[in-house]
Amino acid sequence: MKRVLITGANSFVGVNVEKWLLQTPDEFIVETVDTMNEAWKKADFAKYDVVFHVAGIAHVDPKPKMAPLYYKVNRDLTIEIAKWAKKHGVKQFIFMSSKIVYHASKSLKGDVITENTKPHPNDFYGDSKLQAENGLRKLESSSFKVALLRPCMIYGLGNKGNLPRLAWLATKTPIFPAWHNKRSMIHVYNLAELVRQVILRELSGIFLSLIHI
């Protein structure tokens, strides 16, 4: 039996991972906590085996004035929660990062991202995620495993990201140029199963999809 705490109580990924894990109640006890106003510090981290950290700012706002907030939430809060988890005996910390740590594609040229691709973020959203990853790696030890998830575009019922916008646009303007544009996606339930396997197998390291964007 694994006891899991999910940060980001109402997030798209958090809600769906919780539902997925609870389909096997003999394997998991799952609880959630909000990260607003340090509410997470009231949770008893000592009773959990795993923290799945989903809370963060997920979409890019290009305004430079937003950069400090991204670093505060995506980097500083992540590392603070991980330190708290380690201090209280949590054995595994799973961080919801993003393929954006490689770069935000701004051209029609296709780039293939593999496990050998080196991160090179070109905006503060990606950089805040990468800096969080680097901070988490410094905390890793034999008794505190760190798993970093770098998924591609996530879709599924209830998603408010880019794909629903594109689908809506297609219904209004069903004419697309002759571009051979490819982009990998992952259904939220497939992502949830990845999280499930990472927990059950007590894995650490970096996990991503092979991406053609």
Regions found by a protein language model. Name each.
Residues 4-20:
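N-terminal Rossmann NAD(P)H-binding glycine-rich loop of SDR-like oxidoreductase domains
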Residues 40-76, 80, 84-87, 101-104:
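NAD(P)H-binding glycine-rich loop region in Rossmannoid oxidoreductase-like domains
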Residues 62-63, 168-186, 197-198, 202, ...:
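A conserved pocket-lining segment of Rossmann-fold NAD(P)-dependent short-chain dehydrogenase/reductase
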Residues 71-78, 94, 128-129, 184:
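Short alpha-helix in the Rossmann-fold core of NAD(P)-dependent oxidoreductases
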Residues 72, 107-154, 175-178:
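Catalytic helix-loop patch of NAD(P)-dependent Rossmann-fold dehydrogenases
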Residues 130, 144, 155-165, 197-208:
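Glycine/proline-rich active-site loop of Rossmann-fold NAD(P)-dependent oxidoreductases
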